[in-house]
Design a protein with these regions (language model features):
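A short linear-motif detector with a strong N-terminal bias
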Residues: 10-15, 38, 45, 101, ...
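Conserved Radical SAM active-site core
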Residues: 53-175
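Iron-sulfur (Fe-S) cluster-binding modules
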Residues: 1-13
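N-terminal pre-triad scaffold of radical SAM enzymes
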Residues: 15-70, 87-95
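Sterically constrained small-residue positions within well-ordered secondary structures
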Residues: 7, 23-25, 131
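Short, functionally important structural connectors and interaction interfaces within domains
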Residues: 8-11, 22, 31, 52, ...
Length: 175
């Protein structure tokens, strides 16, 4: 996204665990739904339990693993080990999880969320701009978008500057 003269892009950042395109149930028209990480509730009927934790977490899918041990070699703090020919992941270890996930050729290790700047998120949203001309737009969902209120407000302002209709799905939880 290129900024117009006089436009200021904020440096606030937030954690997003998914961006769904061509959503038709999250507001009027065809929408892009941006899922914020973090929710203070633990509803039994939660449709997005991967969004409950505020911080990104490493995911391991054993069925994808080919036991190449690249992750074990990339692990500096012992967060990934091979025990009895099985990969063991200690999510509490202080590791550079992004670097470890990057060396996994089969994506058996991945992060459940990514950090986005406002500019990067708006860039992703604008990939669907053609659908916003008539009645679509972007819906911010979660998790709970208001847990990352500074990031949400900056995103809302940036979308307004671009003429993108916005909606928020929320439990109305705020700090």
């Amino acid at each position: 996204m290129k900024l117009s003269q006089g436009q200021v892009m904020t440096t606030s950042k937030g954690y997003i665990f998914d961006i769904k395109r061509f959503a038709t149930h999250d507001g009027k028209g065809i929408r892009t739904t941006v899922f914020f990480k973090g929710c203070p509730l633990s509803c039994k009927w939660c449709q997005n339990p991967e969004g409950l934790s505020y911080l990104p977490q490493v995911l391991y899918m054993e069925s994808k693993c080919m036991h190449c041990l690249s992750c074990v070699h990339a692990s500096k703090q012992g967060g990934v080990k091979c025990v009895n020919h099985k990969i063991s992941v200690s999510r509490n270890a202080r590791e550079d999880w992004d670097a470890i996930c990057d060396v996994c050729p089969t994506l058996a290790l991945s992060m459940d969320a990514k950090e986005y700047t406002v500019e990067k998120c708006v860039h992703e949203i604008l990939k669907d701009e053609i659908f916003f001309k008539r009645e679509g737009g972007v819906t911010f969902s979660g998790g709970e978008p208001f847990l990352q209120s500074d990031f949400l407000i900056d995103l809302l302002k940036a979308c307004k500057e671009k003429g993108i209709h916005t909606a928020i799905e929320t439990s109305l939880y705020t700090d």
